[in-house]
Amino acid sequence: MNIYFINPPFKAEYGKFSRESRSPAITKSGALYYPLWLIYAALYSSKQGHNVSFLDAPAKQLNEERSLNIIRKTDNEHSLFVLDTSTPSIKSDVAFAGKLKALYPHSFVVLV
């Protein structure tokens, strides 16, 4: 199975959004916590024999359009997308998931 793990974009124009911090927010200092739970899941899936892709959009301050372009450019036809979410960004995360589903209608999109 081809699985794409995504830390989705959120207000990239304002700075880096840290979902993993104690209080998820756009950081004033620019500090950014790694999306550890998403990385753990990606590593476990890889060890189980799945083809894994990973995108950390907030780390690169990617907006939705640039993130979707990167996803489209991968060679694999992904059957599962796993998106990291948080309460402050949930509306944006759901909208991004909807765009993924529109681009890949036969794939599953999971928000965690």
Language-model features, listed with the residues they occupy:
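A short, structured N-terminal alpha-helical element that caps or precedes a catalytic domain
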Residues: 1-112
